């Protein structure tokens, strides 16, 4: 990417009132994009399940038979690819939570529950909190995850700047976020919004202030599913050995978690997109404050390419997201943002430069906040 092209990528999106309304966008999307195909959805589900099962079988049966020197090469390759394929399955569970898998909500919840539980994600808990993310995207007060800090004084965030403004500190921070970011979010609400209600904020705690009373039974049901999977892994570890469970399931799960954290982080963290406080935020502004990237095309995770349309119309199935995006681009104009920076470069840049947000200085200072990198 040349210097001029990079400058264009980093150019801020407009924050003025767009010349279109939500209904204008909806009318521009081809009608077939809103159609859920049960056969297509199950095709992609079984296609991904077969890949995961084949890799599980090969890893548990054949890789342990390899010479040690060769297994040291094959195991990391397995962890990476299996983690990516588990991430693909996780995305199908995410689709189910948006009711874009089929026309039957009960079927979506059944498939989503089974898939997410198998990947140690509490389905209903995540579904409810993720719904809040879509309802309050890029709101500094009410968004659900990857909520940036507001810098009010120059003395704030000095530790973060020291940590990320040297290569060693940046690597340490990146490894921590990729390894622990997603499970810490589920367990401790790490990187989540600050809740005004008292109580332990966790996706695993039914009485958490994240949820309302009508959702708590489903949260408990999600916990039961997680406990069943953990118990099954425990029994397999007793029968086959803890090391085999770690290698076949545990480390691919860590890779999957890293994929999930990095994908969601990069879709909402970019120098060109704003965050808003309550004085300036509205739903359309928030939905437009995401970015399309080329992050996981090799693994057929198309939602990473078309995240803007996903926030505008989350019920559009991923296999129609391309057509919907192409139809919307002419209308969105400069309000649409795409960044083709390679995954590893984008992650390094954003974790280095997007430390905190603050409003622009000047007499027209508003509730629009941008990522800043300098003290």
Curated annotation (Swiss-Prot):
GO MF annotation list: oxidoreductase activity
UniProt keyword Transmembrane helix, yes or no: yes
Topology in the lipid bilayer: Multi-pass membrane protein
Keywords recorded for this protein, A-Z: Fatty acid biosynthesis, Fatty acid metabolism, Lipid biosynthesis, Lipid metabolism, Membrane, Oxidoreductase, Transmembrane, Transmembrane helix
Gene Ontology cellular component terms for the protein in this record: membrane
Localisation per UniProt entry: Membrane
GO biological process: fatty acid biosynthetic process
Motif residue range(s): Histidine box-3: 307-311
Residues spanned by motif Histidine box-2: 130-134
EC number: 1.14.19.-
Motif position, Histidine box-1: 94-98
UniProt cross-references to Pfam families, sorted A to Z: FA_desaturase
CDD domains membership: Delta12-FADS-like
Transmembrane segments: 38-58, 66-86, 168-188, 219-239, 241-261
Principal EC category: oxidoreductase
Main function: Involved in the biosynthesis of dimorphecolic acid (9-OH-18:2(10E,12E)). Very limited activity with cis-linoleic acid (16:2(9Z,12Z)).
PANTHER family: OMEGA-6 FATTY ACID DESATURASE, CHLOROPLASTIC (PTHR32100)
Family, similarity comment: Belongs to the fatty acid desaturase type 1 family.
Protein name: Delta(9) fatty acid conjugase-like enzyme
Provenance organism: Dimorphotheca sinuata
